[in-house]
Amino acid sequence: MSALSGTRLVFGAGGVVSGLSAAQTLDLAQGADELGYDLFSLSDHLHSERPTDDPFTTLSWLAGQTRRIELATNVLALPYRPPPVVAKIAETLDRLSGGRFVLGLGGGGYDAEFHAFGLTERTGGQKIVGQREAITILRGLWSGKPTTLAGQEFSVHGARIDPPAARPIPIWLGAYGPRALALTGELADGWLPSIGRVGLDGARRMRTAVLTAATRAGRDPASIVCATNVIVRLGQQAPPGSGVVSGSVTEVIDQLVDIVAVGFTALLLAVPTVGELETLARDVLPAVRAQAAARTASS
């Protein structure tokens, strides 16, 4: 069973780190694997202020050079690839990695990329419809059965892939707006925002919206993994309002415990070096687990 599907507090690496060489990315993934982190993820952008790699290609490469750590897109810009193509790639990656893949999906938040690369520009409503249709197509194709959907954004007509997915591949949505949060609660296996973008109070309100939508859809809210990206700068002082967790070991522990208290059970820690992952694993994360557990027990 995936370490990410329960209520145990887990930690990941990678995520919003960019500008790394292939060798640095490999070191980071292998270091996270060896240090006991549970997930390594990569973002998805055609263009960025710093160099980035295609996540599917890179995660496939990393799957062959890691042992146990799960691998995720964080998050895949859905409009860049047709859902049937995503379904086939995701099934292959999950199979070749031994069932270690998590598909993080987003509607595509950077409209400038759509315009620059000649992609179809979609309204917010069209992105939500597209995500709903894509999830239906993905899960239908992964079942191995012929799948038909005449959608507004995406359509398939008796399509199937072979082999089918060996398991239900988890789908996490990088959701922020009311409609996206409602869709997450209704259909997704996980919710993946960035805490630095929304803050503690915003994250608390959004999580409530996700869980309320899950209940309304007849789902168990506890079945939804609540994960978040966290940029960490240990030993540094980030500017106020930057959304970066920073400071001394004690200060970083306190800030991470506050994030867990919102209801997050997976913290994806964005640091650029294995040395920083090692310091966090040794000096910070055991204390975060202990203090978070104590806070839960006393509440």
Predicted regions and their residues:
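Short, acidic/polar
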Residues: L20-A32, V86-I89, L173-E186, V244-I259
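N-terminal beta1-alpha1-beta2 module of alpha/beta enzyme domains
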Residues: M1-Q65, I169, A270-V274
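Active-site mouth loops of central-metabolism enzymes
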Residues: F11-A23, L76-P84, A165-Y176, Q236-E251, ...
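A structural motif
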Residues: Y37, G98, A188-D189, F264-T265
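Internal, glycine-rich beta/alpha segment that forms the wall or movable "lid"
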Residues: S2-T7, P82-L187, D201-I224, G235-A238, ...
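Alpha-helix-loop-beta-strand connector modules within alpha/beta enzyme cores
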Residues: T52-N74, G130-I137, L141, T208-A217, ...
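Generic structural signal for well-ordered alpha-helices
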Residues: T25-Q30, F56-S60, A87-E91, R132-R139, ...
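Hydrophobic faces of well-ordered beta-strands that scaffold small-molecule active sites
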Residues: L9-G15, F40-L42, E70-N74, F101-L105, ...
